[in-house]
UniProtKB/Swiss-Prot annotation:
Its main location: secreted. InterPro entries: Antimicrobial_frog_2 (IPR012521). It is found in: Secreted. Expressed by the skin glands. Keywords: Amphibian defense peptide, Antibiotic, Antimicrobial, Disulfide bond, Fungicide, Secreted. Belongs to the frog skin active peptide (FSAP) family. Ranatuerin subfamily. GO terms for biological process: defense response to fungus; defense response to Gram-negative bacterium; killing of cells of another organism. GO terms for cellular component: extracellular region. This is Ranatuerin-2B. Disulfide bonds join 23-28. It holds the Pfam family Antimicrobial_2. It comes from the Eukaryota. Antibacterial activity against Gram-positive bacterium S.aureus and Gram-negative bacterium E.coli. Has activity against C.albicans.
Amino acid sequence: GLLDTIKGVAKTVAASMLDKLKCKISGC
């Protein structure tokens, strides 16, 4: 459903943001 799609997108965005933060903090 739509809610599941939104949840999936939110998880993907959160994961990519966390990866970027990790790169800034400790390098890629």
